[in-house]
A protein has these predicted regions:
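Non-catalytic accessory regions flanking glycosidase/transglycosidase catalytic cores in CAZymes
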Residues: 2-261, 290-313, 317-547
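Substrate-binding/catalytic cleft of secreted carbohydrate-active enzymes
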Residues: 197, 201-206, 265-293
């Protein structure tokens, strides 16, 4: 009886192993030249203005996460920002175009946002007290954050039907805020003009011609107020959804040197109420659709505004506060990291995640301030991925394997980001550069040859070993999985270990596995991996600035 049971269990386990697909492949990295470059500080997160009673789909997930009432003294918040130092924080969102500043000649009383029928987004105007502005700036200074602050771009305008707003922008209140900021010596890295007013807008829109004229006015304000300052903040705009004709016209109207960065928003997963968000996240075809926007914006900048650059100013995946029990769980990292990799390929300099805290899509839990899985994804990117982007491709047939390559951050070599969207296929991968070793033969350096023999891959895979750093026999691997293989888990595993605050309340160290460079990379189904090759021979990385 016992022998039969053992035999049954063996056969069952063998059947399970055989039922899991294994696909072998070769990843080629073009290390001779960069294809794109990000900013030194690519990772960014937002702090919004939504009050606690902002609700979507009978869910009110914002709590006290607004820039107006966030607990700036919470140790988890401070440590989370400092671990990403310098983290760019974009302060802004839907309500910023209804926000006044209690400074200078403002005559109206300074009240917080309140629910109001007929108001934009269902809220009244709000007001930022200078006491709170002081507190925010002291907080930013203490945590080492780089600040992008969104200004009210509707002040002075009037609605004229169909969500279109007309009239010149009234710069007086913004002037007083910026003047106060300069007088206090507060370091604002960039000022952003407006939120989601481009094209058709969301609740309101402004024509590209009018917007451009007002940006020229704002640039004059900045040049005047910062004339005697060592600080020279950037002007970024429009913080909206990308409409090609609108963005083209904006650059043509403003001309050279006005807009330092074009910001656009990404919510390519649709509404947070969608019951199939996780399916969209794991669908490679759906994830790839947004690539057309990155490509088109890059072309717009090359044609009309070479002095400018592309930023993702806000991206939460699913709009209306994100997907409940999706955007704050492990499965969202498939979307988030794929976005970071894809945006980088198109010279996106900055990528701002909606949000640092607040809504369902916060990097930190709104109530406990404990990091959600995407926080650790951002932290790994911040620690490992340099600003120089390399071309990476593979001969894997499955579209479920997503591959991105950068020069490593602050050291020699390269770092790969590998994403496996398949729930069935395990990938066994070799890595090599595209530059062939001279051996008397000829090899096409720009085309991947699909071969049936995995051993052939193995023989070719380490052509770079010996040309540089031949004494290094290990690579670093960081494998990310969901706890208990439950994709909606709020706990991420790094190499099998849960990522949680230490007993001392510190962010955990992100320790890699050291794997022989002579062995293949094994990427499990529904997993993500960062793989660092410390001495991969990539000439494009030689000149990379050490951070």
């Amino acid at each position: 009886m016992g022998i039969h049971l053992v035999l049954f269990l063996f056969l069952a386990s063998l059947r399970l192993a055989l039922s899991q697909d294994v696909e072998h492949g070769l990843i080629l990295v073009e290390g001779t030249q960069a294809i794109a470059e990000t900013d030194d500080n690519f990772i960014c997160a937002t702090i919004d203005w939504w009050p606690h009673d902002k609700c979507d789909y009978n869910n009110c997930p914002w709590g006290n996460s607004s820039a107006a009432n966030l607990d700036l003294s919470h140790p988890f918040l401070v440590k989370a920002i400092q671990a990403l130092k310098p983290l760019r924080i974009r302060v802004g969102g839907s309500l910023q175009d209804q926000l006044l500043y209690e400074v200078g000649s403002l005559k109206s009383p300074c009240h917080p946002f309140q629910k109001m029928k007929g108001g934009l987004f269902g809220f009244s105007r709000g007001c930022l007290q200078m006491k709170r502005w002081d507190e925010l700036n002291h907080f930013f200074n203490n945590t080492g954050a780089m600040v992008t602050f969104g200004l009210n771009a509707l002040q002075g305008r009037h609605p004229s039907g169909h969500s279109v707003w007309r009239g010149d922008w009234d710069s007086s209140n913004a002037y007083d805020l910026i003047n106060y900021t300069v007088s206090k010596g507060y370091k604002i890295d960039s000022w952003e003009f407006g939120n989601e007013l481009s094209g058709k807008g969301i609740a309101a829109s402004v024509s590209a011609v009018q917007y451009g004229k007002d940006l020229i006015k704002l640039k004059e304000v900045l040049n005047s107020l910062y004339n005697n300052s060592d600080l020279k903040p950037l002007l970024v705009a429009p913080g909206g959804f990308y409409y090609k004709d609108w963005y083209d016209k904006l650059l043509q109207v403003t001309g050279p040197g006005i807009v330092n960065a074009l910001t656009h928003h990404v919510y390519n997963l649709g509404p947070g109420s969608d019951e199939h968000l996780d399916r969209k996240i794991l669908d490679p075809e759906h994830l790839s659709k947004v690539e057309a926007i990155f490509r088109s914006l890059s072309e717009t900048i090359q044609k009309y505004g070479h002095w400018s650059s592309a930023w993702v100013g806000e991206a939460g995946g699913a709009f209306n506060s994100g997907g409940r029990q999706i955007s704050n769980t492990f499965v969202d990292s498939f979307w988030y990291l794929d976005q970071l990799g894809m945006a980088s390929r198109y010279n996106t300099k900055v990528y701002c995640r909606q949000t640092l805290i607040g809504g369902n899509y916060g990097l930190l839990d709104t109530t406990t301030f404990v990091p959600n899985p995407d926080y650790y994804s951002a932290l790994l990117w911040h620690q490992l991925m340099g600003k120089t982007v390399l071309a990476a491709s593979s001969d894997v047939f499955s579209p479920s394997l997503r591959t991105y390559a950068h020069c490593s951050k602050g050291r020699d070599g390269i770092t790969l980001l590998l994403i496996n969207l398949s729930n069935e296929t395990r990938f066994t991968l070799m890595v090599r550069d595209r530059v062939p070793v001279s051996s008397g033969g000829h090899e096409n350096a720009t085309k991947i040859h699909v071969e049936n023999s995995f051993l052939s891959h193995l023989k070719r895979a380490f052509s770079w070993i010996g040309r540089k750093g031949s004494d290094v026999t290990f690579r670093e691997e960081y494998h990310l999985n969901a706890k208990d293989n439950y994709l909606r888990s709020q706990t991420m595993l790094l190499n099998g270990v849960p990522l949680e605050f230490t007993n001392d309340g510190e962010i955990p160290t992100l320790d890699p596995l050291l794997i022989s460079v002579h062995s293949p990379i094994h990427l499990a189904p529904l997993s993500i991996a960062f793989v660092v090759f410390p001495y991969f021979d990539a000439p494009a990385c030689a000149a990379q600035t050490k951070l």
